[in-house]
Each structure stands twice: as structure tokens, then as C-alpha cells.
Amino acid sequence: MITQDTPALNPTEEHYLKRELLRCQLDYEIGKLNDQFALRKFGYPFSPNDPTAPQPISNNDSSPVLGGKGHFSVNYPMLSYVLQEFISTFPLLSTNLLVDEKFWQSKVQVFFEHFMSLGFSESYDREEASKRKKVSKKLSKVILLLFNSGVGSFQEQAYYNEDKFVLQSGQARKRSNIEKFAMPTRENLENLLTNESVFINGWDVNIISVFNKNSRKCTESVDNDKSSKSTPTSSPKSHAIKSFASTSKWMKNAFNNTINSTINSMPESSASLFSKLSLGVPSTKSKQSRKHHYFLIKIKKQDDDDQDNSNEENSNLDHHAGYFYVTRTYSDFKKLSHDLKSEFPGKKCPRLPHRNKKVTSMITKTEVLHNGQTKSAAREKIVNTFDTDLQSASESDNSSFLQTTNELSATETVLTEKETETLRKNILNEIKEEDNIDEDEYEEEGEGEESDFDEYKDASDSKINTLVGEKMRTSLRQYLRTLCKDAEVSQSSSIRRFFLSGPNLDIKDINPKIADDIRNRALIDVSNLENQIRFQQMALEKSLKLQDSMKDFKTSLLKDEKYLMSLLVEIKDNTKVEDLSPLLQDFVEWCKIYISSMIYQMFLGNDNSYELYTQIRRLHKLMPYTVMGQIMKFTNPIAIMRGMIELFMAQPFGGHSLLQTMFSTILTDDLKTQKVAIKELERKIAEMDPGASVVTKCLKDFVFNNDTKDEHDTKLFTMDAVNAESESMNMPVPLIVLMKSAAANLIPDEVVAGLIESYSSWKLQKEDTDALNVTSEDQSGIYFTHVKDLWQLYIKEHDKQLMRQLWQDPELTQMLKAIVTMIYEPMVKIFKVARMDVALKNFEKFMSDLIRLVDDVINGQLGVSTQFDVVEEIHNLVTKHQDAFFEFIHDVYLNDSEGIFEGFITWITTIVKFLQKSKFGGPSERIDFNKLICRDDIDIDVKLLKVQVNNVLNKKIGARKIYKKLLDLKVKQGTKQNNKHAAGILQKNWSDINSLVMPSSSGSFGLGDGDLVDLDLDTGDYDFLHKENEVELEKQYKDLLNLVVDESEIDKLRSQVFAQELKNYLEAQIAKK
């Protein structure tokens, strides 16, 4: 009871009481869903009875237990509201099926109860967040966000006026303007790429050069330097030139001035390595000659970064303090991949890129400046790709090279038509001289050798440089950096051996040709970044034009819920982009730039772009567009979809469907692979300890047979008990299982003692990550590592077995069939009259034009004299096809008999209106919590309730302050790092450009920065702040988050009155519609 002497809740206390009540209610509802029969108490549209029972399914409209549509169970008011208001009303779902209770009861409810009965592992069992746990956390954030903004307290407007918590990132967004926005120059990019470290989990890794080396020995002589300046003599041609792809000798003869060396063997020391890089070509060759690609890797550990900010007066190659320089072959990369699979059998590591034989040629034109210095600009030309023949190349009148960099540099010059023609004639002359040159030989694994020839200079002093293995360089660099992103893999012994074993080469002693190769490859990296900056410049121009329009759009959207519908009418009335209003035209231009940038990033700009492009290109060639178009033109899409669904999901004679068989087969194959890894680990463990067989048997029995044991067995202990004890003792789960098994006399104590000793060694090794190789004294640590990995494999094997059983049982297939039908039914009704055959032809034309353009870029089919600009060409390509795409959207909307387009607008407007209730809603749309705690029918200690609310409030305020410090530190460090890293600069630029058009501020929608921070705190989703350098702040923050605040009276208020009050409030909101 509350008396007159009891002070009322102030606006801040009322707001946080509302938050805590909502959070407690949501946690309660999600926790209740862990019950196998939870949906029987959920309410509409589920059944309170056994859904598999033969009796007729109850009609919820007349059920006093469940209520009908628009009514919620007091046990699940929040989740019921989300289901009825946001999920059931989603436009792409068939209305008929959604209102059909049989779908929810006989399909969804039956599957839910079956799934919960199987007993899949939890996140704690895996020592990592399971997919279900991650989805649950994100779902909790979204729902809590909705209701915190959608349910208003009586004094909440006063609270929002008082709460001025703003994060630095939000302030930075407000300061974003054209004056603050700066594009880096070519010189800055080159400096950032070559001099500044980019650490990923403590490693800065870059492959800076690729060079060839003969595996056979050749004679070394003092005359190598002289022979390098003369024309090489080669043996007679051994076999005919077959194709551009298989034989590219003429290209290498013309352009390979970067690394024209053949070396016999890999020396142990860096001095001998680089001193033996011959500048000449052997006078004789044979078919048995073999060459390898050697990748020069530049590596740095983060511990050595302290002295790396000194004066940068030296050249790029002299700036090497703290770096390791090692060489590796593709075989070394294969061994690394194999070692990682052996060291982490339960981890899915990135796939090693396939070999490719592509050669990148680039043109650099040197111009003498007035001060006598020289400057070169890069032109990337890839000349050996796909199916281009030497013969067709020699007959082509347009064979030339592609210019890929922009004209940012004032001193940069472009080859004239005459110079280009001179280059072309010399290239064709080299083709005719091919009879005197031997073809390339490749390893049996497919690795190609590259010959090295003298540098060619045209009349204008333009140099053509061939960069062997450039595509492999970027792909393998991406592979290494992806490996380093995994914290455990980055500190593994396999990675450390790969990076640090062998001699540390002295970069000062490198051959000048290798030095040129390093510079040229850096210029290609700069060129890719420059093209991205060109996209950013275009996006910035469009964003500035669109900025004012978006402000008006945002204001109109908040004031008039029909404003979006009026914009949608333009799509219905017009067939071309040029006929749209200025706002939509600007928006389309902005979208085109992002699409163009995405295309460049996917196919040309990233390290792994080439592999993705070859896959897309191959798929495009195999796609039967004409046949598909004819089918879409003359055949009913509904019948096709129905036939496909019946084909995959039909169960002839009561057997398994094709879909069930497919997934069961895949899971069976996975289980076979899993069993091989398990047996290998069991063998290793058995070799390391005589009692290890008892350990593996105990763990396996606990994972696979614990659920089948007698519940009254005194020796039985559950996974929940193990997890609780593991968390309280801060020890790994498998160790707790073995300790409890030993306590129950299931295994000998000495076996557990040996594992505990191994665990202690493992912890010490984990803390000391500087040891490169594991010595014999550290074998006990490896013993525990294998046991821990074996536990994870057992858990995953158990889950895969359950997943296979789930696919074999009919419940999942029946639900999937109903869901697919529910989704495709409204879509095919639209596409039936949307001229899909025309849309498919237009898509084929777009893809063909795109493939042709990218082919020309890669193959170097576009001349340098044409002032070709890849950035502008991609944008023009998108512009060329924009009307075809817009016409398709127009046709779909015009024939939208299901109202999907307008349904999306209504659905989005409903969400926006709901989010604004707490900040902008009227008195009738609010809950008065002061009246709520004054009710006579509750047993609440209001003074204690206020104390608990203030304790929660103090915890949140303290957490906000530390969170803000951590975030400000992160932003400050991020800004500092972004200014040092080229990729960081580009990412920051995109963020600033985006904020001009679509500000990240959510205050207008009822969401403040403080509320969003509290949301992270409520759900424990603060991974964003992990791994910062400020350890003390992190410790304070985590300690505060782990501080347990007594909320007994708050939860009592929730259970006694708030759940019912929330139910009534939400039902009243629906009744108003």
C-alpha cells in the first residue's frame, strides 16, 4: 500500500520502472518458451490442447482460455502483440493462411513441440553462442526497443526533456559537412598503404611481391648482370602455341621487365637469397624446367609498433623497423591450411584460394619534372585471362591496354594515339618472334612458370611491367587476413610458425627488380583505392544535393502518414526515371552510385574479387535465359511453383521426400567427416595419456547417453548443473563433467588429476603467446586442448544427429511446405501479370553488358588513348539499364492485385507510429505508474520499490558514463587509426556521406542515444566494446554490468498487476484501429 506520505515517482524513476517492468516481462515470456508445451498457454492463434490430437481444433474466437484475434494471454502479452501486429501483417505473407488457425496449430505448434523435445545443445555446452542464442538476443533487443518506445509512461515527456545523454558519435554526425569532408590524395594513399600498419588481432600481414624461381639448378656467373641487358637466347620451340590462356610468352617477352630473373634454389640467408636473384635469362631451357611462385610476405607483430611512428624520411623500402620479411610458396600455404585443420578440427577455417595463372601487366609513364625528380603513375593491365587466343590477339586491330586509374595527379600524362600504336606494333612483332621462345611449363598441381625478359621502352619512355601472380597475391593476402580475424587462430602455433619460422630476410639487400615489383604492386593497390574514392566523390556530390530534400522528406513523413503513399503513386504513374519528381530522381542517382560502387567492389576492387567474378561469369554463361523466358511467358508460374514444391516435398508411399533425402544425405556426409576428426583426436589423446580412454568414454557417454539414464539415479547429474558449476568456478565444462564423474566414482581420480594439471599448463601457455613452438615440456597443455576440442566435436556430432532426425521426421517438412506456400502465393499472382519474361531478358542484357565490361577491364581490351575511366563506365552501365529496372517495378506495382506495395507502406507506417507513442503520444496512450502502485489489490512495498528503482537507475547512469568513455575512446582511436589506414579513411568517408542523406539519429522516431545504450545494457549485447586498449575502463564496465541489483519488488509488481495492465493497454491500442 502507498500512503500520502509516500513520495510519488518522478519522471526519471517512472521511466526506468517502466523499462525494468518491460524487460522483466520480456525475459519472463522468452523464458517460458523454453517449455515444450509453452504455445498451449500462448493464446491466439495456438491451441490450448494437444495439436496432434484427433479431436477438432478449437475455435479461438469462442475459447474463454485463449480469446480471439486482438486479445492476448496474460502470460505472453508482448510476444502476442508482435505476432498479431507485426508478423501476421507482413505484406509478403498470404493473408488466407495467416488467419487460418490450422496453419499455426497443426504446422507451427506441432513443429515447436517436436523441436523442443529433441534436446539440442545450449550455448554454454558449446562454450560459444549458439545460433538460437544469438537470434534470441537480437530478437530481445528488437522487441524491447519496440515496447520501450511504444508504451509510454505518464510523465515520460518530462523525462525526455531532462535526458540529454548524447554520444560522441552522434555529435560527430551532426558536425558532418562538406568542410569536414576530405578526400585523400594519391600520395597519402601510397604512404598509408606502404608505411602504416593495419593490425588484425596483433598481426599486420601484407604480401608485397611475387617472383619466380627455377627448381632446377643453373650455372651462376659474373656475367649475369651483363646478360640481363642483352637479348636472351632461348631454345627452339618445343610445341605449338595453343591459346592465350595456356601460353602467354609473347606478353611476357613484351612486358616482363619487373622480375626478369631465374634463380636456382632458395638460400637460407636473406643476403644469399637476394644476391642470387639473377637479372638475366638462362641460355638454355628444357621441358623439365620448373618454376615456382614465391610470395614475399611483410609481417609485423603489434608489440613492435611502439617505435614505428618516427620520422618518415626514408623511402618506402627503408621503412621496415619491426617487420619480418619471409618468402612462402603455394605449397607452404597448403601446409598451413592442413595444419590449421589438424590443430582446430572443430573450427571452420576459410578455404584456401585456388591457384590461378593470371598475369597482370601495368604501364607506368615516367615524366621528368622541372626539379629533376621523376614521378610514375600506375596503369593496371591484365593480359592473360579466359579464352583469348594469341592468334585472335595478333589479328585484333584494337588490342591495347586498359587505363584504370583516375586523373587526380597533376603530373600524370596519358599515352597518345601514336604512342599506343607504337606499343601495339611492338607487341605484335614480339608475337612473330615467338618461334624462338619456349612455352611456359607448369607444375603438376597447376602452378605456372613465368619467363623473364628485358624491359621494353617505347618512344615516350613508357614502361610496361608484368606482375606475375598478382591475382594469387591479393587472394592469398585476403586468406591470411581472414585467418587473423579469428582470435584463436591468430594466436595458434600453426600461424606463428608460418609467419615467423625461417630467416628474417633483410629488405635492404633485395634485388632492384624485386624492389620495382614491390613498388608496382603497391601502385596497383593505390589504383584500386583511387577508384573507390572516385565513387565517393560522385556519391558526395549527389548526397549534398539530396541532403535538403531528405530533410523535407523526414519532416513530411513524421507529419503525414500518407506522404509515403503519395511518393509510391509516382512509381505507379511513370515508366521512366526522368519523369519522377526531383526528390525521387536524386534518390535514384544516389542509389545508382552505391550500386556502381558495390559492383566495382565485388568484381574488381577487393582481394577476392577475381574468384567471385569467375564464378558469376561461369554461372551467367550456363544460365538458360531463353528457355526460362519462354517458360515464364507461356506457363502459369503458380503451377510451376506448386509442381516444384510437390516435387521436393512429396512423400511417395509414406517415405521420405526429396528435400528430406537431400538434407539427410548432406548431414550424413558431415557426420562421416566429423567421425573421422573425432577418431583422429581420440587417437592423439590415447597416445598422450594411458588413462585417456577413460576420459573420452566418460565424455562421450555424458553427451550421447545422459538423457536416457534413470532420473532417480543418484550418480546422474544434468547439463544444467554442470553449466552452473562451470560458471561459478570459472572452469571449462568438460573438466567439470570429469570432476563430477570422479566424485561419483565413475572414473579414477588420478585421471582427472592429470587433466587438471594439463589444464593448468594450458592456461599458462594461453597467457604466454610469445612462444613460437610448443616444446616437449608443454605437451600436457596440448593434452587438455585436445580434450576440449573433442568435447566440442561430441556436442556438434550430437546436434547433427538430432538435426538429421529433425529432417527425417515429417513435422519440419510439413511446416516448410506451408510457409513456402504462404510466401510464394501472393508473389506469383503478381509476377503472373508482370511480364517476367521481359524482365528476365533485361536482366540478361545487363549481366552480359557487365560481364563484357569487366572482361574488357581485366583483359586490357580498352585503349589507353580513349581516356577510359572504369568508374564512369560502371556508372554509365547502371544508368543505361535503369529504365528497364524501373519499368519492371512499375509493372509489378501496376498489377499488384494483392496490395503488397501499399501493404509495405502501411506496415512501415504502423511501426513508425508505434515507436513514437512514448515520446509524442497523448495522455490516453500512456500508463500512469503512480496510480498503478497505489492500487489496493496489490501487495507491494512501495518504499522498497523506489529504492530498487533508484538502484537500477544508479547502475544505468554509472554504466552510461563508462560506456560513453569507452565509446569516446573507441571513436577517438578509430579516428586516429582511420587517418592512418587507407581502408579506414574510405570507410569513414562512406559513413559521413551516408549521414548527409540518412542521419543515424533516431530521436525523431522516439529513440534517444541513452535509450539505445540502455538497450544494450538490458540485453547484455555489448560485444561492440570488447578488445579495447583501456583495460581498466573495461573492467569497471564489466564489474558494473555484473553487479546484481535486487529487483524482487519490481518483479512482484510485474506479476501482480503490470502483466495484466500491459495486456489491457495493448488490446486497447488495437481496438482503436
Swiss-Prot record:
Primary localisation category: endoplasmic reticulum
Region (Disordered): 218-240, 431-456
Keywords: Endoplasmic reticulum, Lipid droplet, Membrane, Phosphoprotein
Biased composition (Acidic residues): 432-453
The organism's place on the tree of life at top rank: Eukaryota
Gene Ontology terms for molecular function: phosphatidylinositol binding
Gene Ontology CC annotations of this record: endoplasmic reticulum membrane; lipid droplet; mitochondrion
Segments of skewed composition (Low complexity): 229-238
Compositional bias of kind Basic and acidic residues: 218-228
Note: Present with 3080 molecules/cell in log phase SD medium.
Name assigned to this protein: PX domain-containing protein LEC1
Species of provenance: Saccharomyces cerevisiae (strain ATCC 204508 / S288c) (Baker's yeast)
